[in-house]
Regions:
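Conserved SAM/SAH cofactor-binding pocket of Class I
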Residues: 55-143, 149
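Short alpha-helix immediately C-terminal to the canonical SAM-binding loop
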Residues: 99-101, 170, 174
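Class I SAM-dependent transferase core
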Residues: 1-64, 98-101, 105-113
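SAM/dcSAM-binding transferase cores
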Residues: 175-230
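Short glycine-dipeptide loop
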Residues: 156-162
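Residue-level signal for inorganic ion chemistry
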Residues: 28, 81, 103, 166, ...
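Short loop/edge segments at beta-strand edges and connector loops
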Residues: 41, 118-120, 190-192
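Short strand-turn motif at the edge of the Rossmann-like AdoMet-binding core
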Residues: 165-169, 193
């Protein structure tokens, strides 16, 4: 399966995405020798487990949406989404400045536009212009769903959505997070399962709709969403 075949199943409005993914791969691997960005370095694995995986949410994102990626790391899922969906307005948030430096460098190499923020999620949310300011919030960060929901749902506009990227089997995790999601103003709309190409595993998108405003006390500070999740 070549790149064109792999990505043909995804909604895309960008005709030169193959070239941009090639640049992304080369820059990621080169920069990774200086800064630890990814443990996955095999080309096929990067394309499937990082690039293709990141793009799975494309079909659920409205045209021209304001999108923020929380805990983006090396740009996943936000940058691959922007590569195939140049219409979205993308914002990337990460707590480590070395990752933001890479993402600013990458933006010039890819010749695409996005904004970067060196910030913890709770600090980013404390800014009035960000709180409930985005149609779509995405995150592939490694954390329990109830923790991610507390960091991400406060950023979602009423009627917008939070899309959490998860591994294959998340039924128990979703069930254990339902109360937290309700408290935060969300409602699980869909749990969508995918098989990655080349038998590289399965993935799940948990799509949560914002049905009411999030109480002002969330997200809590002092790392409480992780230490004592809702």
């Amino acid at each position: 399966m070549n790149t064109t075949e792999m990505f043909s199943v995804l909604k895309s409005n960008n005709t030169n995405f193959e070239e941009k993914f090639e640049i992304y791969f080369n820059e990621l691997i080169d920069y990774n020798t200086k800064v630890n960005l990814t443990a996955i370095t095999d080309k096929e694995d990067v394309y499937i487990k990082h690039f293709f995986d990141s793009c799975l949410a494309s079909e659920f994102i409205p045209n021209n949406a304001q999108v923020v990626d929380i805990g983006t790391g090396a740009g996943f899922p936000g940058v691959p989404l922007k590569i195939i969906r140049n219409d979205i307005n993308l914002n990337l948030v990460d707590s480590l400045n070395k990752r933001i430096v890479f993402l600013d460098y990458l933006k010039q190499k890819l010749d695409i536009d996005y904004s970067t923020y060196h910030s913890r999620a709770e600090e980013f949310c404390s800014d009035a212009k960000n709180r409930e300011g985005y149609e779509v919030v995405v995150s592939r960060a490694v954390a329990k769903l109830n923790t991610l929901a507390e960091y991400c749902l406060p950023l979602v506009k009423l009627g917008g959505m939070f899309i959490a990227y998860k591994g294959g089997d998340v039924e128990q995790e979703v069930n254990e997070s339902l109360n937290a999601i309700k408290i935060l103003g969300g409602q699980v709309q869909e749990v969508k399962n995918f098989n990655l190409p080349m038998e590289k595993g399965s993935r799940t998108l948990v799509i949560i709709k914002k049905v009411k405003l999030t109480p002002k006390v969330y997200p809590r500070g002092k790392n409480l969403p992780k230490i004592k999740p809702l």
